[in-house]
């Protein structure tokens, strides 16, 4: 079943949307590839930045917030991720109505302003407002339109284009942790934040200039049906639910691989190196599988990658105790989890009308936001109830991946039937 037929087949649930002539999709060209480059840079400074904020946990506990528990401090970093994803439906609706320039420009100001204010913050509420709320919402206004815009320029190459776009977040997840680790002891917290903010500002100038959309955007009056309409589409709801469980599973290793490694005897310095290893490997996970997906079918490759993620968690991370096993898991899980993040937007495009693409991407990310916010506390509570062991926390992650895989498999059957060799 082709992408074109799928797109046409999903116009039914959104009949209330304004009728716009379908744009010509060039599948290449200077403007299209500049959009991919700008979008990758935008994800570098938004999603890539959020990948490294856990490094501030020890800084806050030692200095600015030394009177607070580690659990209290962790809300600052987890809430930034939550705000980035949960406000994505609003970012997506702005994209659908005005194109990428308006939301990305507003987001650029908020993201940089939030980080600058965080550099001056000394109290809990100040850091929560500046880093979690203002910077988080700004990241959402950058992240969602940037991830969506390149998809309007391509049809046959959507997989690899989606992978190249989100690969920027992988590079950010490597560069920013290394920057922060080296800058904190040399220039202190304030100037570390300012240097990162100035770097982000410069890169966002490039993103604002280069990102464009191939779709005609028209402002729409507020209508409840525009917001609830996609949720009447069974295929879309299945993808939302599957995404929730996949993100429920993904963020357990992201959040606990370091503390679990230290718990089982790895040195602190080596344990922290697992973060750039995982993020570095995810670069390949967000590009190579996406290229294969354009040839073999995007749903097919996604289901394989979610299954492999479950196997890695349950068969490798769960019994792992030595340094070699944990490093191997970090690298391999970086590849499979990177593919899940990279292919996610491409699947949304495949079952959605272009006129609602931004909002639908944002809605799926909002479901994912609930997973990212709740899975770390649940995983921590499971470990605490098990005497500090992470055995059942790993099981929770692996089972979440399996449930997400079943949801994707059910959606694939609805779209193309039971044929295992069907490209879908």
From Swiss-Prot:
Entry GO CC: membrane
Species assigned in the record: Penicillium oxalicum (strain 114-2 / CGMCC 5302)
Listed Pfam families: MFS_1
Keywords noted in UniProt: Glycoprotein, Membrane, Transmembrane, Transmembrane helix, Transport
Similarity-based family: Belongs to the major facilitator superfamily. Monocarboxylate porter (TC 2.A.1.13) family.
Subcellular location: Membrane
Role played: MFS-type transporter; part of the gene cluster that mediates the biosynthesis of oxopyrrolidines, polyketide-amino acid hybrid compounds with feature structures of tetramic acid.
Encoding gene, per UniProt annotation: opdF
Region (Disordered) location: 1-23
One GO MF term attached to the UniProt entry: transmembrane transporter activity
Biased amino acid composition, Basic and acidic residues: 1-10
Residue positions with a glycan: 208
Keyword Kinase: no
InterPro entries named among the record's database cross-references: MFS, MFS_dom, MFS_trans_sf, Proton-linked_MCT
Protein name: MFS-type transporter opdF
Membrane-protein topology: Multi-pass membrane protein
Transmembrane segments: 36-56, 102-122, 127-147, 160-180, 187-207, 239-259, 265-285, 299-319, 329-349, 364-384, 391-411
Glycoprotein is among the record's keywords: yes
Disruption phenotype: Does not affect the production of oxopyrrolidines A and B.
